[in-house]
Regions:
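C-terminal catalytic "cap/lid" subdomain
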Residues: 1-234
C-alpha cells in the first residue's frame, strides 16, 4: 500500500520513479532532489503519521520521527552510484542516497524510557547536513543489532523467500543462520528483496538470533511471522 502511495504521488506530481540495477543485482530508486522531496512528503508525512494513528488506536503512545529529527540517523552521502544499463556499467552522479553509519541512541532511549513507541523512517542526515535517502532494511538491521533484539521481521508482498519466484508454493521455510550467506540462499532474493537479505546478513552478524521474511498482506502479519510463518533464519 505504501509503495503504491509513493508511486502514485510521484506520477501525480509529474515525476515518475526511476530504478537502478546495481552490478551486484540490487535494485534501488534513483533519488534526485525532486524524488527526495516526494519521498519526504509521502513517508515522513502520510505513511509515518498513518502508522502513528493506527498504533495510537491500539493503545501504543507512538511518536513519528524521520532520521533527520534530532540527527537520529546520520550517514555518508554517495557521490556516485554505479548501475547496469543494456549490459554496461554506468555511473550516476548527483544522487541523494547514502548509508547510515550513526544512530542517536540517546534520543531513542529517552523516548523509550518515557513510554513512547518511536515510528521511524528515512531519510537520514548526511555529514554535510543534507537529507539522504537510505535503505530502511539496513536501518532495521542496525537498530535490531544495537538493541540486541531477539528477532527482526521483514514484511513484503510475498510470503517469504521463494525457491522458484514468483511461485508462492515454493516458499523456503527455514534457513540455518550459519548458511544465510551461502550463494544458494542469497540467490533466492529477487529485485528489492536483495536489500532485505543483505539486512538479514548484517543482523545475523550483529548477534540477532532470528530473522523472519514474512507476508505483509495477511492479518496480524507480525504475530504470524513470530509464530513461525514465512522464511525463518535462525
Amino acid at each position: 500500500l505504501f509503495i503504491v502511495t509513493r508511486y502514485r504521488s510521484a506520477l501525480a506530481l509529474g515525476h515518475p520513479p526511476r530504478f537502478l540495477t546495481h552490478p551486484g543485482g540490487q535494485v534501488s530508486r534513483l533519488t534526485d532532489r525532486k524524488t527526495l522531496e516526494i519521498f519526504e512528503m509521502v513517508y515522513c508525512g502520510l505513511v509515518n503519521k498513518r502508522l502513528v494513528e493506527l498504533l495510537q488506536k491500539e493503545g501504543a503512545n507512538a511518536i513519528g520521527l524521520s532520521g533527520l529529527d534530532g540527527r537520529l540517523f546520520v550517514g555518508r552521502r554517495k557521490t556516485a552510484v554505479k548501475y547496469v544499463e543494456n549490459g554496461k556499467v554506468k555511473v550516476h552522479r548527483g544522487d541523494y542516497t547514502g548509508t547510515v553509519e550513526e544512530v542517536n541512541k540517546a534520543l531513542l532511549d529517552l523516548l523509550l524510557q518515557a513510554g513512547y513507541l518511536p515510528v521511524l523512517t528515512p531519510p537520514a542526515l548526511s555529514y554535510e547536513n543534507e537529507a539522504i535517502n537510505t535503505d530502511g532494511d539496513q536501518i532495521a538491521a542496525l537498530l535490531a543489532t544495537l538493541y540486541g533484539a531477539e528477532a527482526l521481521v521483514y514484511l513484503s508482498n510475498v510470503p517469504g523467500l521463494l525457491a522458484r519466484y514468483p511461485d508462492e508454493a515454493s516458499l523456503v521455510r527455514e534457513i540455518p543462520v550459519e548458511r544465510i550467506e551461502d550463494p544458494e540462499y542469497l540467490a533466492l532474493a529477487q529485485g528489492r528483496m536483495k536489500r532485505k537479505v543483505m539486512g538479514a546478513v548484517e543482523a545475523v552478524r550483529g548477534g540477532v538470533k532470528r530473522v523472519v521474511f514474512a507476508d505483509a498482506r495477511v492479518e496480524n502479519p507480525i504475530r504470524r511471522a513470530l509464530s513461525g510463518e514465512g522464511t525463518v533464519v535462525r
